[in-house]
């Protein structure tokens, strides 16, 4: 079996603790928790009212067009935007 090398050249992050590598890093080193009361949808039928939600994500701010955004699930939007961030971060 051939061992293949992988080189990480760029990072893109969409997470409950922030959007972008610098925001996430700063939240992590400051010990900031992303767990809060859920406000993204009705949780009255669930046993818990807290979660770590991705907040303040606007796909249009990060370059997706309206046509692209409406064709993508929210999580696909996260992946596409994070991949774009990683490509830009790589300076390739």
Predicted regions and their residues:
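Conserved "HGTGT" condensation-loop signature of ketosynthase/thiolase-family condensing enzymes
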Residues: 1-92
